[in-house]
Amino acid sequence: MTRHFSLLVDDRPETLMRVTGLCLRRRADVVALRYARSRGGRAGFARLELELVVSERHGHGLLERLGALVEVRDVAELRSTLKRSDG
């Protein structure tokens, strides 16, 4: 199953390795990653968008585990609004 996450993280060199390492340990394949440093009032932070392919079994609790990382300030799972067309 494909899952999408948006994270507000500390803009530090080890942040990407910690987040992707957690995904690897949970057997989630990172299929897309976007990292953008914050501008203006949120200096020192970055927005990290993740698209993961993970089994339901291994994905259980992934949102909570991502949020428990020290470098992660906020995490949200994004729901897909795309509808499949059968035909």
Per-region residue spans from a language model:
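A conserved regulatory-domain signal marking ACT and ACT-like small-molecule sensing domains
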Residues: M1-G87
